[in-house]
Amino acid sequence: MKRLTYPLSSLRNIVEHFHCNTFHKPISSLSISPTLKSESREPSSTQDPYSLLKQDPVDICLSLWVKSFSSPPSATFSNLTGFLSKFDLWVLAYQRTCAHVTGTFPPRNAIHANALRSLLSLQNAVTRSGGKFRWNDKMNQYVRSPKDKISMNGGEGMSKGKVRRIIESEEPIFQDRVVHEVLLMILEPFFEARFSSKSHGFRPGRNPHTVIRTIRSNFAGYLWFMKGDVSEMLDHVDVDVVMNCLQKVVKDRKVLGLIESSLKFSDKRVLKRVVEKHGNDNGLGTKRRIEREKRNKTKKKILSDDEPKPDPYWLRTFYSFAPKEAAKVPSYGYCGVLSPLLANVCLNELDRFMETKIVEYFSPCKDDSIWKESIEDGCHNPAWPEFVPSSGKEKTRKMDYIRYGGHFLIGIRGPREDAVKMRKEIIDFCDRVFGVRLDNSKLEIEHISRGIQFLDHIICRRVIYPTLRYTGSGGSIVSKKGVGTLLSVSASLEQCIRQFRRLAFVKGDKDPEPLPCNPMLYSSQSHSNSQMNKFLETMADWYKYADNRKKAVGFCAYVIRSSLAKLYAARYRLKSRAKVYSIASRDLSHPLSESSNNSAPEYSDLLRMGLVDAIEGVQFSRMSLIPSCDYTPFPRNWIPNHEQVLQEYIRLQDPKFFCGLHRSIKREGLTLPQDEISEAVWDFKTLGAWRSKYENKREADDGLQKLDSQT
């Protein structure tokens, strides 16, 4: 019997590293002079915050995930205020918020007592019925950021202009971020257990790679594709729509009230942005703003000791290659990191609607080569889908759906009329449920032969002519030429060129010419090569599941290597890339130096003395060094590892499982896996069959006798 067990420590480590895949710029909390505070916040003098630290917060999060995944899908949760009252969760939320703001995760025992008392005051203001907590209350902050420069005894005040800019800022303050983290840790488990498996955006364990692998595995055989765009829901959504979706799972009034109050600020913020955008300043304000932005770009910034370092150049460059489906992050009112979760809560209604339509549309046909009987038939290899004939009147009708963020893709095996009908139903559903009116431009229908771009990958069909060999009636080998189609998922080189051109790495369209990498002008050769190597490694991983991975990564390596060569030619006065390559070699790993500086010591001497860093060559200088596409099979009903661990852990906690295990041990006894393998090999070697596939000894003897009579 095959058993899969996970220790509690393994499950604990997985739950401990759950996080929201949303990137926000680190910000500082408001620092207001004590003279501006409207009222003082007195923490509870009767409660010692250290006495409230009773549990490990990771164990509390673990219990939430186990409870949510073990509950039936239709279950609702009406008492979540008890989790809000657990001070251990607030301490963990404070630690995570500090990590976002300062870049370091403070240990629990390193948090100052004053910070714990302020955190307790914030908890009381949120949880108690008469609490005075308000979102974005910059004049009355309970908890301050560790980056706050104002000391506890007063400190120095700020100028009126800086105070006004902070008050008018739309960035959430530190204490709001703490409340966001607490609500996220409580709400995420209950909704993750009920989200559709068709959704992959802003969810733990899922990413664009899982979307691409799912398309390769499940979307073979579809002729018509519909690419939908509902990303306007990531910018603004009606408060009633969000609350109605939340109330299907959460019934706690306190939690719902906190979320509703944070969403109501959304309309005011949108209105403020519209007024600022269309304001009448006769061009003077815009001109000053542009000049100020230029000065800020060229101004050298000195980081504080506790300020996180900005992202390195290679990472900023890679983020610029983000596809449009993954570039937009939801932002609702003052919800902060809760916004992606709330967006998925709303769009989950669309996922469930499409799952119902998929079942209704399925119409099997015995004469087809795939999906003859069941919608779950997987008769072709999930890594390399088998040859799929075209659909017709007598062929199977089938549909599939997948969503990433505010963009989704629908594959239809049937006539185009069915795709048009499905588009009308989606438009009516979004108008009725979300109040969003979509036009046909947001729901484009394309044939597979034209290619569909999704997540900067092109989904198309390749026609191939394989030679099919089979054994004829007389025992001879028959070879026959066949025709088939193969689903292809390849990287979009046109989109890659556009991104390089936008970042000033190349110029031109059809035959792009590399440009020097000016941002690395004042960096050393070793640092420049190291930065570009990290970028190329990340790009090679991004195109990991593209059929043309070698071609795409090879083009990126050519652009980066040529850009660096032009930069070195200008820096070391070598006039051309050819001279740079002749000195530094093809991968630019040999040191370069100015020809006019003959008194400079040799690079080998400086390297031996530790005065310079070793120069690593630019990767992927030859096509043979670029890894091929990863065709690892992807299961059709794939679920992330943390969900597998949770399901297995819940199953091991069920007494019925151990009763069944005990009965099987009493009936079959204990055997080692090595013994079972040896028995199977011996049976196949001596008898040509495995005894264990029969239920009893009599069936085994009858089956073996039939095999003997046939031979």
Curated annotation (Swiss-Prot):
Q: Which cysteines are joined by disulfide bonds?
A: none
Reply yes or no: does the keyword Nuclease apply.
yes
User: Sorted alphabetically, which SUPFAM superfamilies does this protein's record hold?
Assistant: DNA/RNA polymerases
Q: Which CDD domains match?
A: RT_G2_intron (cd01651)
Ranges where the Reverse transcriptase domain occurs: 147-459
- Give the UniProt keywords, A-Z: Endonuclease, Hydrolase, Intron homing, Mitochondrion, Nuclease, Stress response, Transit peptide
EC number in record: 3.1.-.-
Briefly explain the null phenotype: Slightly slower growth rate. Impaired splicing of mitochondrial group-II introns-containing NAD4 transcript and altered carbon metabolism. Altered fundamental metabolic pathways including amino acid metabolism, triacylglycerol degradation and polysaccharide synthesis (cellulose and starch) during the early stage of plant growth. Reduced sensitivity to 2,6-dichlorobenzonitrile (DCB) and isoxaben treatments, cellulose biosynthesis inhibitors. Increased sensitivity to sugar concentration of the medium. Retarded growth and developmental phenotypes (e.g.
A GO MF term: endonuclease activity
Q: In which tissues is it expressed?
A: Expressed at low levels in seedlings and accumulates in adult plants.
GO cellular component terms given for this protein: mitochondrion
Region annotation Intron maturase type-2: where it falls in the sequence: 484-653
What Pfam family does this protein match (any one)?
A: Intron_maturas2
Q: Provide the function of this protein.
A: Nuclear-encoded maturase required for splicing of group-II introns in mitochondria. Necessary for mitochondrial biogenesis during early developmental stages. Involved in the splicing of mitochondrial NAD4 transcripts. Required for trans-splicing of NAD1 intron 1 and also functions in cis-splicing of NAD2 intron 1 and NAD4 intron 2. Required for the regulation of fundamental metabolic pathways such as amino acid metabolism, triacylglycerol degradation and polysaccharide synthesis (cellulose and starch) during the early stage of plant growth. Implicated in stress responses.
Q: Which family does it belong to?
A: Belongs to the plant nuclear intron maturase (nMat) family.
Name of this protein: Nuclear intron maturase 1, mitochondrial
Q: Which organism is it from?
A: Arabidopsis thaliana
